[in-house]
């Protein structure tokens, strides 16, 4: 996966806001009724595919997370990782969510979240980083959900880069989260080697913890929505570049590039064009109150103007 719940199984999750990415491993230093309690099938120390997820509390553990994040989002000289040891310590000490995922005693992923508004209802997941293609992001997200439910919370929110295809698929198709707001240049200029040179547009998603499709998703039973045959292409790909189509139809598809991160390095002009097009089309649709129903790896976002639910 790449990453930050901008991954969740953001698998090559990279980028700030809950995303995930490829990183080097770090060995730990020694030092439907609404659910209000964790599922009995998912213990507090969640395990998935030989991954153990648990809360982190020591400076040695926080140092490992800082190292992991530095590998996922390599900083430029003079800059640090998205969350450093001091903030990790402060978040954990204040009762927020700081957790690590381990495989064979090696830290392979970590997530940081804090309580948000409305108070008593919401957890905001700020950063999630994990190794690529290993199921770590899903294990972290299910653990985070159980942690939130045990504290009486109703939802988890996070942001992600809407142009990163694997993140969109993970967040929408695998977790059942719903985009609710388009946030242009949310973090301002970002100077890590993954996001540098591009506006930091993000989409805010809401994960309603007791939504039937979310409960089915964490059991791996939910089937994502298939694009209907009459869906109109509002944004398509032509020779690697974005082409804006009809955005006025009731049901539209919004495409994304195959690999925006690689495009930023090889063709920054095309990457900037994609950013502008996504802001215009997807951002415009969300601003008008349209609903993102899901995400298809090939077709992109499935968006409806008339869906209510």
Which residues are covered by each model-predicted region?
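Short amphipathic alpha-helix that is part of the acyltransferase structural core
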Residues: 2-16, 20-27, 33, 37-93, ...
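Conserved beta-strand in the GNAT
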Residues: 98-100, 106-115, 122-124
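Conserved GNAT acetyl-CoA-binding A-motif
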Residues: 148-163
